């Protein structure tokens, strides 16, 4: 009896061959540009969740590497250079600061006109 586990997610380029080397069969297709961008963003969310769940430094390093891989793929798919991203990163850091001071914003209190 056959079972088919549904994944419906973007995978790294060598995953189909790795699955076949394990004597299994998989069904895949090549995404168009629009769907590729959508699934890259879904993959980024998946990897961010895995970063959040990482419990050791080694796990965190592996998950951060996955995040960087997806970010790089998103850049390439959209014709965005690393320099463009870093430029905006530096502008935002200059304007809004970084995350070095560990500040957690609890709330903003505003006076009402009542």
Describe the residue ranges of each PLM region.
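Flexible "arm" and connector segments at domain edges
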Residues: 1-114
